[in-house]
Amino acid sequence: MLENANLLISTPYKLTREQLLYDLYVAFEDASRGKHKMSYVKKFEEHLAENLNALCDELLGRTYKALPSKCFIVDYPKKREVFAAMFRDRIVHHLYFNYTHQIYERTFIADTYSCIVGRGTLYGVERLRHHIRQSSLNWQEDCYAMSLDIRGYFMHIDRARLLKIATESLKKMSGHKVGLTDDVPLPSGVLLTERTTWGEVRDFDFLLWLTEQIVMLDPMENC
C-alpha cells in the first residue's frame, strides 16, 4: 500500500507480465503511428516480439534504463537543439502516458490543452472568447493578450521538484474513483463499478518507480 495514499483503495492492483506486454504493444502502435517507413521503426519491427519481451522484462524487473538520446539542431520555426529519445524509450513514454494521462488531467486547470482529448483548437477558441468577454466586461472595455515563451524552459526544469509534484499527484489520485463515463482502458479481468478507484486499475508502485526513471533522466547528460 502506498504511503499517504487515500484509504479508499481496497485491493491495490498489481501489474502482470501478460498485461504489461499487451500494453507495450499498444504503446508501440502509438509510438509508430505515421512512422512505419522510418528506419528505426522498421529495425524494431524486425524482431518485434523479442524486443517487446525484453523491454517487458526490464520494466518488471525494475532494471530499465533509457538509452542515450540523439542530439541534433533544427532550424524551423527557429534554430534550436533537440534531444530525441531512442525508439524503445519512446514506447515507454507512450506506455507511461497511456497509464497516467487520465489521472494527471484531473489535476490540471481548464486551460491546459496539450495532448488532452476534447481540448483542441475549437475548445481553445471558446476559452479565449470566454476570457476576452470576462476581461473586457462583456466587450465594454479594452483588454490585452501577451504572448510569452520561457527561454530554455525544458533545459532548466528542476527535475527533483517535478518528481515531487508528479509523485504527490499520483498518490493523491490513487484513491479517487474512476468515472463510470470515462473511457478508461482497464486491465484484463477488472470490472468497473461506481466504487472502483484508480488504485484498483493501475499499479501505483510501478507507476511511481517509472515516474522517477522518466522525470529524473536529463537528456543533456544522457546523449
Please give the residue ranges for each predicted region:
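Short, compositionally biased low-complexity segments
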Residues: 1-3, 18-34, 66-70, 97-104, ...
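Non-catalytic, polymerase-adjacent accessory regions of viral genome-replication enzymes
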Residues: 1-53
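Active-site-proximal segment of RNA-dependent polymerases
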Residues: 10-14, 97-159
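Short, conserved non-catalytic motifs in the polymerase core
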Residues: 34-42, 67-93, 107-119, 191-200, ...
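N-terminal accessory alpha/beta regions
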Residues: 46-59, 72, 86
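Generic hydrophobic, aliphatic-rich segments that mediate packing or membrane embedding
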Residues: 51, 70, 78, 88, ...
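Amphipathic alpha-helical segments in well-ordered regions
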Residues: 95-99, 103, 169, 214
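Conserved polymerase palm-domain catalytic core
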Residues: 131, 136-223
